[in-house]
Amino acid sequence: MRNKGFTLIELLVVIAIIGIISSVVLASLNYARKKARDAERLSDMRQMQIALEFYHDSFDAYPDSDNAGCGGWDSSGNGTFITPLVSNNFLPKHLQDPVVNDSCGNLAYYRYPPGYAGCSASNGYFYVLGIRDLETSGNPYRSSPGWNCPGRNWQDEFDWVTGSFQ
């Protein structure tokens, strides 16, 4: 006469299958979270570009970099990313990287003087705005506009980068 119920081996097989399925689900959820954070970063960059153009239209210049560390770049790690855009109401709040890995963050802005890195001095000041590390993409990100001068290619330093002359 056979006892009703599951054997130990049957239970172990079921537990192993559940473990495998749950690890696959968790891995795909983690990737989805990374893609969502990258989408937020790219959206922030689009907002930032629009705010920079509004600032330029109002003041006939792009805002200065704060040069407060991070290699002189104005960066998103300290919560004061491009303060003039917020203080002049071109952005509702400071944009910050969704995952701050260090005091610099992944978002960066710098305004360069005319003629820097071999760019034509007649074009005037210019800014570079970029994302250093997208979680789901290598360098460069497929839709990165890119930015370079004869003496420097910022796309080599960022996953996504853009810029504009004043």
Q: What are the functions of these language-model segments?
A:
Residues 34-61, 81:
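Membrane-proximal N-terminal amphipathic helix
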Residues 35, 94, 153-156:
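Exposed, low-complexity/repetitive linear segments and helix-based recognition motifs
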Residues 1-2, 33, 39, 140:
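Generic N-terminal leader/processing signal
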